[in-house]
Amino acid sequence: MSTLIEAIIAREVLDSRGNPTIEVDVRLESGDVGRAIVPSGASTGAHEALELRDGDKSRYNGKGVLKAVQAVNEDIAEALIGFDAADQIALDNELIALDGTPNKSKLGANAILGVSLAAAKAAAAAFGLPLYRYLGGVYAHVLPVPMMNIMNGGQHATNSTDFQEFMIMPVGADSFREGLRWGAEIYHALKKVIHDRGFSTTVGDEGGFAPSLPTNDAPLQLIMEAIEKAGYRPGEQIYIALDPATTEIYEDGKYHLKREGRVLTSAEMVDYWVDLVNRYPIISIEDGLAEDDWEGWQLLRSKLGHKIQLVGDDFLVTNVQRLRRAIDARAANSILIKLNQIGSLTETLSAIQLAQRSGWTAVVSHRSGESEDVTIADLVVATNAGQIKTGAPARTDRIAKYNQLLRIEEELGSAAQYAGRNAFTSIPHPL
């Protein structure tokens, strides 16, 4: 059995928004093949690795990825043919060196990530192992609590709330399968609640409902009603998580809540979150402050870090350097993990490991532009991260990840452990 790379082939395919993205196949001398499709975000952090787009307005409004495809089929393939796919760190280092830029702007983070993931999948296939076992070894056994985005706003919907995501977390379930069922039942109860109130039940990019609502906490009221109507207890069995994506509403040093006609300072934004946490069973807030509002983040952690999970997404962009700075500054206590923010599997695993060693949590996440690729489901189990964010229990691009986790839980059998209330290890006094 040889794990040496024999061929690398990239192509342009479509993501869940109908935009082009890159798919990569890596074929080994053993005949085993790994395939990966790279996701794409709508609200992207300024510090993310660069996603290479063509800029040719005559194709896909400039969003084509033929340059990234060419980079894989020519530069990367030439460099990696004959390379050992089982040596992931060396392979990723070779890709990073081949690019030679701080943000992967020469070859594109999408090109590099596609090859990085496809190589790992090919090596796993060669060893006859599922990806989670290949990456995580014998200790990979924790099934994550899903953060289910059941109401969308911000960049993921139009004419909705200022804030981007309103999620539920079934922490009280005994298994992933049960938690997923609870979430799906609440999702359907929410649809009826929204419909009965006379609002639209259209959905956003990630499958959550996106009605036009008068205030930013109106979705929380609807979600609370839906949880109870589905027969569950908010604040006991089900908690709420938020991703307001506040970088999108941050301008000239202030936070502009257009839905409410208010402009807030960093300190006032922190007080806004403190008030919401006191009124609703919120367990996690992601990007509660803008990506470069470091003082605001420190204040937020000092006010709420002992009670809830404070997740950095645009703030940290899966970047070890920014994560290390945030740990030292006591800003946030959790990192969102998005493979394409940093652009390689090795760098992603390094960020997760640093977070876990530092007493932080790591939440493995999709992007709003997704596909049938289920890599993140295996990744979250491989790293025992305990939390996954992959949308509503709707749309095949989201459901694919949930279904893969159901398969993994079944395969693990009695060894499978649902993270449940133990997922929030960064909070001094967890649930």
Swiss-Prot record:
It catalyses: (2R)-2-phosphoglycerate = phosphoenolpyruvate + H2O. Its EC number is 4.2.1.11. PROSITE patterns: ENOLASE. Its main location: cytoplasm. Mg(2+) binds at D243, E286, D313. It is found in: Cytoplasm; Secreted; Cell surface. Its cofactor is Mg(2+). One of its GO terms (molecular function) is phosphopyruvate hydratase activity. GO terms for cellular component: cell surface; extracellular region; phosphopyruvate hydratase complex. HAMAP family: Enolase (MF_00318). NCBIfam families: eno. This is Enolase.
